[in-house]
Amino acid sequence: NGSAQGSKSDNWEVEMATRYAKMGYVVASCDYRLGWNPLAGTQEERTLQLIQAAYRGVQDSRTAVRFFRKSAEEDGDPFGIDTEKVGLIGNGTGGYITLASSTIESYNDIILDDNGAPITKFWYDPGDGSYIPMVIEGIHGDPDATTDTYAPASVGGFQLCAANHVGYSSDINFQMNAGGALGDLN
């Protein structure tokens, strides 16, 4: 993937949203946090940044689901949604995010295999011969983005995950990948 950008207003997204809306569905085309450098100096750097960007996309898609459930319950349902029928559809990286959002149940799903052993392709060597996960829950947040987390003070201490709409379900009832990969977790 050499694309570090995309938008909720890209032609495909607008066309699909319009078609589904004409069929009576409530549609929201949502952006998610971008941010990886496809031209980073090493493959390891590019992989690390891409995995972290995909993780943020999962968090953002789940936060959007909670936003709509919260708006239905607390704000008089301004969008007219059925909170029991919430789905995700994505294309390209958005397709990857919809699949990951529907298959990752917990943080351990992205770092450990079914037997509890590290999924080594999602770990990296920071340069000292040790291996650490590419995504660290205490720094990057949980997969649902329901905890506030910050980068270490040594690299700025800025917020990486802001908990929003905590207490509402992030569950989706269906997902459709209209083009995009599925990360091989095992």
Language model segments and positions:
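A short, hydrophobic beta-strand element of the alpha/beta-hydrolase
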Residues: M176-A178
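Cap/lid segment of the alpha/beta-hydrolase catalytic domain
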Residues: G2-E13, R19-R56
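Serine-hydrolase catalytic core
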Residues: H165-S170, G180-N186
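Hydrolases whose catalytic domains are alpha/beta-hydrolase-1, hotdog thioesterase
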Residues: T93-S101, L185
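Glycine-rich His-Gly loop
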Residues: N1-S3, N91, G95, G180
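Solvent-exposed, polar/charged alpha-helical surfaces in well-ordered, non-transmembrane soluble domains
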Residues: V14, T18, K22, Q59-R66, ...
